[in-house]
Amino acid sequence: MTTNNLAGLPERINRVSVNVANQETGLLTRSSHFSFLYTKEAPAVSLTMPNQPGPYNSGALHPVFTQNLPEGYLRRYISEKLRRHADVDDMYLLALMGAKGIGHLSYDAGLQLPESEPVAIEDILHWSGKDKLFPQLLERYYLNGMASGVQPKVVVSGSTLLQKDVIVKAFDDEFPLLTVNEFVCMKCAEYCGLNTPKVWLSDDLQHYVVERFDADESGTKVGIEDFATLMGRPGDQKYSGTYENVLKVVRLNTNSLEQVEETFKLVAFNCLIGNGDAHLKNFSLQYHADHTEIQLSPVYDVTHTIIYPTIDNEMALKMRKSKAFPSRRELVDFAYSTGISRSTAGKVVDNLAEGIAACLARLDEANAMEGLKSSIEGHLHNVMEKSHIQPVYRHDKKKKYY
């Protein structure tokens, strides 16, 4: 966005019209508190906020509206770019997000922002320019939709009708080659049969690219709510909770044992892969605007955190009153406490362990980050060894990556 465009922005925003799947839904305002008031018979903005005659008042902005706001790097970048022209707070970020945020909620405060030129995925993956690519993408796309999280990332528009929008992530000095780390973990998840979006890793290892999954096959956006929102918690409480409650929320909202089992599979995968950052915002449910077909969203934001010395060697949430990574037996006991049979849970854990080991054995990128492969393998061995069970890793030579 040019300086002239920035000069036309209002200094402050206190009223934002909220839409669900392009249908006017209500008005969000700020005075001494935040207030959201539905229009008559409008679709609900959240599974936790049914349409009601009176307003939803809150001292802080409602979780469903804050869940996709940028954190850390991107938020600081936006604030710095606009600081001479606007007071960038949560309401302002919603207005800037417009219709390009994750999920089917969109926001209108009358801002007119220019469209950014699209970029082909191939140009990102095979970048060979002298200057670093990510700063250029950030400059072009920092207002092109937003995604939560502290990792440097930007939403990039697809260059063709067949190419969906993607999220491009980089890394900083604290977490070197986090791009490789996440790519490897996501490929392991795919190998294990979890529902994953398409992902890519650039030739120079500087960029991890993931396809957006917040639209159905017809291109209609779906609702997406992370578990902090579903539990009525602000994002800064994303590490407060238990995996037991994660599964309870799934059961309550889907009334489906299959979805509960799928969520257990994802929780168990995070434990086996050594992801200590599987917090409430890294799980979500998705659904249509009429709140039908509620199901677990595809896997996202999975990394092997144990390899980084600045991150505690423990889980993000508690399981059975502890944040220590569980053993196989403890995972099975956890599943049983949530209504899943021990035999089903045991098979899930064993199959995941086999899948992770087999994927690491054949995925070339697992060797692109020094120590990553051995660290994951060591953690996996420790989890399974605690129960004196050695998984038999079957290697399917027919299964390959493309």
Protein language model regions, located:
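Phosphate/dinucleotide-binding and metal-coordinating scaffold of catalytic cores
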Residues: 1-280, 284-402
